[in-house]
Structure formats: C-alpha cells, structure tokens
Amino acid sequence: MLAKVKLPNHVTVGSFKVQLVRIPHEIAYESSDYQGSFVSKPPLKIYLDEEIIDMGGMDAVNLVLHELCHLGFYQYGLKDKEEEHIVNSYGNFLTELLMRSELKGWLLWQIKNA
C-alpha cells in the first residue's frame, strides 16, 4: 500500500483559495450537529470533522466534496440561476477541483484505497 496522502491545508479553484480546517468531532456536533461547514466570508474556510477525515474512504470524500460544492455555489453565484447554468457551472467547478487543485492527490489516494 502506498503512503497515505494527507488532506491538503487549502484548495484553490480558479481565483478562490479556501482553507480546510479540521475540527474535533465533539465540537462539530456540539456547535450545530454538522460534519462540515463552509464559511463564505473572507478568508474562505471549510471546517471538517476530523474523525470522519481520519477514517477516510467514501464518507470522507463525500464530506469534502459536499462542502466544496458550497464553494462552487458561492463562486459561480448560482442562487436563482436556471438548471443549465447550474449544471454547466458545476461541471466547470468539478473539473477544476478534480484536475488542477491541491485536492487531487488526496482524492486519488482515497479512491485507490477505499
């Protein structure tokens, strides 16, 4: 098995750089019963339940992608947009995320080792 790839400290998609912040499981659930949270005011941050991230696999990937989709929604200004605009924007966003961002290595490791 290859060495485990750590979740990056930040992800850059286009001109948007978002910090990935791991928080203790107890804090995530005590503060508002969430596993992750996107903060859309600068500096952009995503808070992630470290227990889920440490477990890795499908749940960790789902959590990270879910929160990053909030970034895409914010980045492309998708509130009140038509379906085709939303789908096209997410296609562009996910392509950038999967092909060029700092998250690529972590995602590939998770997929190969799930």
Where are the regions a protein language model picked out?
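Active-site recognition of the HExxH zinc-binding catalytic motif
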Residues: 62-74
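Metalloprotease/metallohydrolase-associated module, dominated by Zn2+-dependent proteases
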Residues: 1-58, 75-114
